[in-house]
């Protein structure tokens, strides 16, 4: 927990990442910004210490230009003339596109769809504002974050539900670099409490640095629960955004920002398992 009191602006406050971030700042005052562009006008008078831009349109392609790019631009315009400790934009590992090696922050962005393109565009806009106005504006790129408050339709919560019900699960191919929500938030905090020069225009990957296949994740669940459930493998089904390589290079985050993820995937699944069984 961050016991000091800060004034914090946050978008995406009702989402998985935003909720967990807010819980760390337990004594702070928040200005919560939704999707109404008019709410951005409140930021300057609020005089924030930190701005966390975690909100984004993921599903509706028609809304992505306005909700992602224009919204980000307007927030940056609203803060360019005020002093603050850090503005952190939550990008996405999907900005990289398909790579054959662990993904580095300096890699070329090769988006494959509108969401990835808008996230990559916002990253570049944030970097431009950081340089134009000499501001501590930085970007975090989360990989496959999992943990409390994650939406129930996602892979890890689905596995928990299926194992608790002891019902069959269908799994297709895919690889992910899973990072526990507590490790992700720790990384965000290491970054945002850095000096201006270490934030300004910088990007850091926040993953664990190891990838697992979906089938390996299933096996970990079998170990944690102590029993198997029926598995329907569909090896021929590979989605557009799936890849045989999806792993973060986290050397920069470790070396420059003391990022040190604590939970390997089995430890993280066991931690959530214990939480769910002690409710």
Task: Label every model-predicted segment.
Residues 74-114:
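Conserved Rossmann-fold NAD(P)-dependent oxidoreductase catalytic core, especially the SDR/UDP-sugar
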Residues 114, 118-122:
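Active-site helix of classical SDR
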Residues 167-279:
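C-terminal substrate-binding subdomain of Rossmann-fold SDR/epimerase-dehydratase oxidoreductases
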Residues 39-70:
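NAD(P)H-binding glycine-rich loop region in Rossmannoid oxidoreductase-like domains
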């Amino acid at each position: 927990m961050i016991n000091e009191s800060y004034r914090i602006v946050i978008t995406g406050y009702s989402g998985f990442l935003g909720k967990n971030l807010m819980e760390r700042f337990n004594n702070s005052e928040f200005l919560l910004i939704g999707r109404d562009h008019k709410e951005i006008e409140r930021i300057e008078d609020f005089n924030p210490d930190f701005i966390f831009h975690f909100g984004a349109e993921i599903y509706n392609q028609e809304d992505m230009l306005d909700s992602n790019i224009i919204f980000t631009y307007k927030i940056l315009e609203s803060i360019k003339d005020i002093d603050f400790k850090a503005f952190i934009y939550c990008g996405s590992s999907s900005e990289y596109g398909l790579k054959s090696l662990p993904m580095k922050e300096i890699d070329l962005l090769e988006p494959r769809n509108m969401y990835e393109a808008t996230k990559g565009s916002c990253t570049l806009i944030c970097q431009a504002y950081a340089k134009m106005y000499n501001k501590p504006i930085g970007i975090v790129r989360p990989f496959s974050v999992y943990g409390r408050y994650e939406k129930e339709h996602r892979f890890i919560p689905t596995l928990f539900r299926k194992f608790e019900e002891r019902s069959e699960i269908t799994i297709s191919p895919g690889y992910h670099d899973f990072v526990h929500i507590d490790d992700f938030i720790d990384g965000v905090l290491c970054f945002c409490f850095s000096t201006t020069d270490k934030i300004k225009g910088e990007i850091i990957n926040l993953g664990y640095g190891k990838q697992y296949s979906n089938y390996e994740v299933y096996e970990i669940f079998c170990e944690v629960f102590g029993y198997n459930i029926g598995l329907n493998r569909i090896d021929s089904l590979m989605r557009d955004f799936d890849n045989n390589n999806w792993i973060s290079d986290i050397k920069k985050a470790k070396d420059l920002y003391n990022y040190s993820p604590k939970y390997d995937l089995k430890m993280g699944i066991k931690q959530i398992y214990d939480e769910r069984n002690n409710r």
